[in-house]
Amino acid sequence: MPKTDWRSILALLTGGLIVSTGTTIPTPSIGDAVTAASARIADNLSNGPHLGFDTFAYPGDDAMRAWLTADKPYKWVGYYLSAPCHTDTTWEGKRETLSNMGWGMAVIYVGQQTWGRTPGERIAVTRYVTKRVRQTVKLKSGKRVVRYANKRVPVRVLVSPRASPGSTCSTQFVSAARGTADANDAIAKTAREGFASGTVIFLDIERMENVPKAMRDYYRAWTARVVEDGRFRPAYYAHNFNAQLIYGDVKEVLASAGVTSDPPFWIASERGFAIDKVPTDVGHAFAQVWQGLLDVVETHNGVRIPIDVNVADFPSPSAVDRNGE
């Protein structure tokens, strides 16, 4: 939560100031002091950090109303577009409802992922083949003879993996061409949901031990297409482990398109997180959102929701005017 301005609190407790000489220094009335202190506290709250949460499926209108008025001041929520690696559609059509309630939003598009593999890399699998096997058999007479028999035996072979039939999310789909196609999908769905021109779309890129060239090509192409279209702004959800590399890559793409401002980054890292910290405390100057508590369950106003907890620089991370005004 935002840090309290104790000078403001002190103003509520003092109606006048007595110095050592015994002279009373005139001060505003207690009513004026309360008004001034309240204004300063409100300023602190509006300046952030702003607490938000994300959850896989839409919790329901009643749940969102309950949480907005709860004791814990969540101000914004992750808004999942249906996407290749997040096919749930429960958030669709809820933008206006959430906006009317007063929720800020962060638009999320979960694109293709590597899932710990390298796109196009051949993998070893076990296959069974029939082989003619030479056997030596001892007869009753004691004589040994050679015979041949067909047997099923395991062998290791290298194969080029394929996406499962009907799948929309696969390591094998990670490529520049798919990055462009997924950007078009994200643009169309953001527009269909009624988000204003200039809305920030966060491309969800999950943690990778190594970032294959195909993945770098994928998110670069995604970025270039969103910029080329011009209706929305590209942004990125990334793990702290990969954030610096991704940032450098997309900055190059943006610079080549004449964009000089930093792209918004939403960084995931549990280390050192607290809800009164600001996003840059995660360790990156370009961080605008920090996700630090994952897979927790909270109950507010009697409504229980499994969530990830985030802090942001803005009360509505995807808004055109992200101060929510």
Question: Which residues are covered by each model-predicted region?
Answer:
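Functionally critical loop-and-helix segments that line ligand-binding/catalytic clefts
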Residues: S38-P59, M64-R65, A70, V250-E325
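Glycine-rich, charge-decorated loop segments at or immediately adjacent to ligand/cofactor-binding or catalytic sites
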Residues: W115-R122, N242-L254
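Long, charged/polar, surface-exposed segments that mediate recognition or autoinhibition
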Residues: D217, A224, A238
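Aromatic-lined carbohydrate-recognition surfaces of secreted/lumenal glycan-active proteins
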Residues: V227-G248
